[in-house]
Amino acid sequence: MFACLRIGRFIRLGNVTVKSTNLVLRCVFIRNFATHADHLFDELPQRDLSSLNSQLSSHLRSGNPNDTLALFLQIHRASPDLSSHTFTPVLGACSLLSYPETGRQVHALMIKQGAETGTISKTALIDMYSKYGHLVDSVRVFESVEEKDLVSWNALLSGFLRNGKGKEALGVFAAMYRERVEISEFTLSSVVKTCASLKILQQGKQVHAMVVVTGRDLVVLGTAMISFYSSVGLINEAMKVYNSLNVHTDEVMLNSLISGCIRNRNYKEAFLLMSRQRPNVRVLSSSLAGCSDNSDLWIGKQIHCVALRNGFVSDSKLCNGLMDMYGKCGQIVQARTIFRAIPSKSVVSWTSMIDAYAVNGDGVKALEIFREMCEEGSGVLPNSVTFLVVISACAHAGLVKEGKECFGMMKEKYRLVPGTEHYVCFIDILSKAGETEEIWRLVERMMENDNQSIPCAIWVAVLSACSLNMDLTRGEYVARRLMEETGPENASIYVLVSNFYAAMGKWDVVEELRGKLKNKGLVKTAGHSLFI
């Protein structure tokens, strides 16, 4: 309030000069007063590049990426000479809007104007390309950074983690350690999350030991450590981390521990922890996520009762969790009832309901809800997760025509960039329909894009399609690509390629591959049965 009064007095007294206003704009930007920033910006008799940069940052910080791009276009038309500080918020806007082509055009303009040289601008480029899933470009930009600082290293590590490349993220961390880069709590937290996602116990314990030995702030890393031990099934170790923090624990840590107990079916401890605090939406939502993972309907219903008693059932986030839980437990009627009762449905609400029908094998109903969402009256636009759920539903239900329509709509109508999982699901749809020519045209279009390599998961999907449709020639090409790109030490790929040749009746090749697998001492991670 005091800051607002000072800004008002500044404007009223007429002390509006370029230099003085730039200083106030920076202050307003830091405090995130977007309206005041707009007012000050409009009052300027002259606008220099510094004030324009501040306004760009203000728009982005206020969550208005479209306004950021619109202002940037005006600046570029009026002043062709731009600084690296001008481009940084623009790259952030491109990242938020998922406009790969626009992002590349901005990058090209940076190179043309010599604004790509700074570490800050290159870090923004690394972040932008990783959000597009273009990790090859992220690595290329990172390698061009002359003075790599902690922020640029963290941007690369986060990019791999964001795209599900856990092993590569750990490789970045190992390189940071070799290069003696000063590692922050953020870095360690990211690495712990990677270990949790990959369920790598030994490396996670090593990071925990590093935290203790180097005297890092365990309060900052506590939630990540609790989540890690919970994910690998060591709930007692998670309890030890929580108890070691004593008075420094917070609600987020407790919620993480409760969720971990439920995921590991330690219900007695979970409800004991719940009794230590007043029930809240956050802890109930995280607990419902555990019930969804375990398909535990009885515990989910108990949590639903707690939510009803405390008047939380009007909260959209909690309702989304309830829908997901009932859907995963096969209770589609209850999920639908909760969905219809939500007054203001978010994109998560719609997606959760679509997914509930999808996981229960009703692709037609899933499409019905999706079309209802896309109607103008809903006021909600589908995102990439929504399309992944819908395309997956079409794949499982064998809805080829509808799957094609959804995949095309994603790119053309909503300007969303399909990710690896979208392509895998779409290839599965085409494969079951026997449309191998369409699959190959899709692969050829992807190969024409030299800036992005085709992920291994897509090649695996194409190989499965070749196997299903008895396409030996193309299957052999894909098999060679997989063997080349994953390296000679990947046992799973050897088995996958071997199974392809077995389906083709090429038993001599199968025997040769199995022999190589044995001679190299490679062992495929074995599956397990819940019954045997």
Swiss-Prot record:
Would you kindly state one Gene Ontology biological process term found in this protein's UniProt entry? Answer: RNA modification
Q: What are this entry's molecular-function GO terms?
A: RNA binding
> Where is it predominantly found?
mitochondrion
Q: Which UniProt keywords apply?
A: Mitochondrion, Repeat, Transit peptide
Q: Where in the cell is it found?
A: Mitochondrion
Outline where the chain's transit peptide begins and ends: 1-33
- Renumbered residue ranges of the record's region Type E motif: 458-532
InterPro entries recorded = E_motif, Pentatricopeptide_rpt, PPR_At4g14850-like_plant, TPR-like_helical_dom_sf
Repeat region (PPR), residues: 48-82, 83-117, 118-148, 149-183, 184-218, 223-248, 250-280, 281-314, 315-345, 346-380, 383-413, 419-453
Q: Which domain of life is it from?
A: Eukaryota
An example GO CC term for this entry is: mitochondrion
UniProt family annotation: Belongs to the PPR family. PCMP-E subfamily.
Instruction: Return the protein name.
Output: Pentatricopeptide repeat-containing protein At5g66500, mitochondrial
Q: Which organism is it from?
A: Arabidopsis thaliana (Mouse-ear cress)
